[in-house]
Amino acid sequence: MRSDQIKRGAVRAPNRCLLYSTGISPGDLDKPFIGIASSFTDLVPGHVAMRDLERYVERGIAAGGGVPFIFGAPAVCDGIAMGHSGMHYSLGSREIIADLVETVANAHMLDGLILLSNCDKVTPGMLMAAARLNIPAIVVTAGAMMTGMYDKKRRSMVRDTFEAVGQFQAGKITEKQLSELEMAACPGAGACQGMYTANTMACLTETMGMSMRGCATTLAVSAKKKRIAYESGIRVVALVKKDVKPRDILTLAAFKNAIVADMALGGSTNTVLHLPAIANEAGIELPLELFDEISKKTPQIACLEPAGDHYMEDLDNAGGIPAVLFAIQKNLAHSKTVSGFDIIEIANSAEILDEYVIRAKNPYKPEGGIAILRGNIAPRGCVVKQAAVSEKMKVFSGRARVFNSEDNAMKAILDNKIVPGDIVVIRYEGPAGGPGMREMLSPTSALHGMGLSDSVALLTDGRFSGGTRGPCIGHISPEAAADGAIVAINEGDTININIPERTLNVELTDDEIKARIGKVIKPEPKIKTGYMARYAKLVQSADTGAVLK
C-alpha cells in the first residue's frame, strides 16, 4: 500500500507515533488509509449538509476495511459571489482545490480518496486532483436542492431570483413580491435546482464513471444520498485493493460519453472549460471541435431549468442518469466505472420512468445543447448554450454596445440604455483579463427580466452561469487581454450571429481588425496582488479549459 511509506519499518516510528496520537490503533496500520476530501462549509447551500454525508462515508470506509481521515477543501458559491468582485475568485478556486487535495493526499501518502463535492468549481477541481494523483477515488456529489414554491408555482434560485431583479427594475413586480420570492426560492440544502453547472458536472461525473449509480440526481436531503455515501465508502476500499485508478476510468471514451450526456441534457457551457481541464490532468486533449462534432449528432432529450420547466427532482424521478444513458446508449462507448460495471451495462439495465422528462422518442431539440462558434471575433472559438436560445435569435445581427467590464454593462442595462437590436459586448473579463473569467448571470438575467432576451444578444470573453438563457455567447478566444479580436469592436459596429452555421463575425476586414488591435491601450489590471494576480500571469486561454501553465 502507498501508505506503507509512512507506517512501516523502524525508521517510521516517529510517523506512527503521530498517527497514534490521532486515536488510531496499531491494527489500523494494516488497513488502507482513505482520505475524505470534504468541502463542507456553512457558507454554501450546496455544502451545508455534508456533515451527515461525512459520517456515512466514514462508516462505509470502516465497513469496507479502511481507515477514514477527513480533511477540508474550500468551496465557493457562485450565486453568492455573483455580480461583484468576489466572482473573480470562483474559477481560480478550481485550481486551488485540485492543488490542496493533491497536497494532502501526497503529503500523507493516502491510499485512496472519497471526494465529497457539489458546487460549480469544486467537482471539477476534485476530478482534476483525482486524475493528477491517479490513486483510487470516488466522487460523492452532495445533491440538488428541492424546488421552492411561490405564487402556486415551483421556483428555483437561479432563474427566478436573478431574473426577478430585472422584473423589479422594469416595474413588473413590487419590492414586496421580490422579497417574498427570495425567501421562497431556496427551501434548504443542496445545489441550485436546475441543469446549472453544479448539477451538470454531477451528471457528467456519474456518466464518466467516477461516482456511484444514481449519485448525480439524488437530492441532498434524501436518505438515498446517505446510502450512496455509505456505499461509496465501502467501494473505494475495494478499488484500493484491486488497484483501480482514476485514469483507468477517465479515458477518452469516458470523456466522449460525458460530452454526449452533456449535449443530451442541455448542460451548462462551463463544461467546455471543465472537461478539457480534467482531461488535461489525465493526459488527454479535448479540443472544442469535439464538443461541436458530438453536439451535431446528439439530440437533446431532457430540458431542465433554465431552458425548460423541469428540475433535478423530476430527472431523478424519471430514472436519473442511468435512464438518460439508456436513451442515448447508441451514442455511448464502453467505459469502466467505479461501481465495477461498464457504463453500457448500466445503461442497458435502466428504464425511463417518465417519458415527458426524458424524451428519447421525441427529443426537445435535434441537436445537443451547446454549440461552438468561430469567426473573425473568435478565431479560436466561443461557446453558446443553444438549448436556451429562442429560434428567432439563432440568426441575429445587431449594433455593438461595448463595455470593458461587467459592472459598466450592468449599469447600462439597469439604466435602460440597452434597446432591442443591440448586442452587448463585455470584454476584459476573460481568464487573464478578468482575472478569473467572471460569470455574467447578473446582466443576462436582467436582460431577460426586462423582456429583452428575444431582441438583445450578449458577447463576452468571460463566461456564463449554467442558469443563463438567451443569445449569450461566451469564452471568446483569444480574450481581450491577449489582444484578441474582441478588442477591435467599437461602439456601433455591426455584429452577425449565426448559430446554425456556427459563425460569429463583426463587419470589419482582417486589416481593419489588425489596425484597431494595434491602437488599443489595455486597461490596468483589476487585481494587482494576491492569488488572482498570480493566476492572471499563469492562466491559459478559455479554449484550453483555462488551465494554468
Swiss-Prot record:
Its cofactor is [2Fe-2S] cluster; Mg(2+). The active site is at residue 465. Pathway: Amino-acid biosynthesis; L-isoleucine biosynthesis; L-isoleucine from 2-oxobutanoate: step 3/4; Amino-acid biosynthesis; L-valine biosynthesis; L-valine from pyruvate: step 3/4. One of its GO terms (molecular function) is dihydroxy-acid dehydratase activity. GO terms for biological process: isoleucine biosynthetic process; L-valine biosynthetic process. Signal peptide: none annotated. This is Dihydroxy-acid dehydratase. The gene is ilvD.
